[in-house]
Amino acid sequence: MNWKDKVKTTFYSCDRFVRFVIQHFIQDDCTYIASALAFTSLLAVVPLMSVGLAIFSSFPVFQGLAEPVQNFIFDNFVPATGKIVQSYLQQFTSQVSKLSIWGIVFLIFTALLVMFTIERAMNKIWRVSSSRHGVSAFLLYWAIISLAPVLLGLSLAASSYLFSMPILADHRAPYTILHYSPFFLSLIGFTFLYVVVPNCPVKIRHAFWGGLVAAILFESAKHAFAYYLIRYNTYALLYGAFATVPIFFIWVYWVWIITLLGAEISYAFSVHHQRRGGKSLDGFSHALLWLHQLWLAQQHGKGLSFNDLVDASKQPFAVDVDEMINALIYHELIHATADGHYMLSRDLSHVTLYDLTQLLPYRLPTHLELQYSKASLAEQWRAAFKRHNEELKKSLDINLEELFKKTGTVIK
């Protein structure tokens, strides 16, 4: 393959990948989900700050760092209106100490609720039918809420210590690192979100690429939003002093748009069959292949993740993987477990190939399709499909004119 062909192939693959991301972004109603998450985030921002600061202040090593952490967050992650929003939120959080025990419980519940909403959105993108429940969900959400301020505090404490060292005091490198630290923190945060929150295994490299795109878009949006507010602040003219609220809501909305787009990119990298070349594996063989893989896993008492199923074939799939998953679940052939894996729902000793042809909306592969699926199909399957095609050919070996003559009258 010469360089021109390589360029064409790369361009075609990128075009398919981008189309896939856009299609799924629209299909998953990400704009609607982003608006719901933005509203939930506004309700939960005070509880989240209160819980985070309470955890942060409980560590003696972080005494005196609470205000620098807040300043760092609002200076680097909230454009233009950050200082005003910060002053309002500090007034709200200062009232938390006056709450009763039930008020504090409600605050914690609201903080956990936003995590549940985020997980549900991520599960929809990764096509996971079940969310975490009970203790496992609580522990994960609480770990994220409690670890985030601690890790941020550790990073700031480490930075302060390093910059105070005489050997680094006169060098420009530490300040260059500090300048780019918001970008790297965004990258780490997005990657962590895409790996941990979905209720299914997500490879770190796939989450990283989605996180990288999201971090770049986030930094770009931050500067663009700040520029717009400085040059064309329509909301300030309309709402006056009250303009901070709609501006902050719009900014949170766009943050969630970027976050969900990064999640769609991570998911697209996971479903790498969309970028494979070659002839597609037909729908019936695809279903049979996945049932076979699940049957093999069940012999060892295990289920398979979404990525495991996608990796079962080196060929691209003719039927979209989401459609196939939904078809197998709908016909009660497989089900999703609590940890996001898939397992068989039926005893396959009582399911015949004929049953499968009647259940699934996919026909048996033709002779031509069998030639292109040598890498994915066992010889026993190929022999059964070949016999079916030969018998079908004998049964339907009648020309249409003869068939119509036998019909006799015109069908009304």
Curated annotation (Swiss-Prot):
A single Gene Ontology CC term: plasma membrane
Compartments, as annotated in UniProt: Cell inner membrane
Keywords per UniProt: Cell inner membrane, Cell membrane, Membrane, Transmembrane, Transmembrane helix
Major localization listed first in the record, in broad terms: membrane
First and last residue of the signal peptide: none
InterPro entries: UPF0761_bac, Virul_fac_BrkB
Membrane topology label: Multi-pass membrane protein
Residue stretches spanning the membrane: 36-56, 99-119, 137-157, 177-197, 210-230, 241-261
Domain of life, per lineage: Bacteria
Short name of one Pfam family: Virul_fac_BrkB
Similarity comment: Belongs to the UPF0761 family.
Protein name as it appears in the record: UPF0761 membrane protein lpg0643
Organism: Legionella pneumophila subsp. pneumophila (strain Philadelphia 1 / ATCC 33152 / DSM 7513)
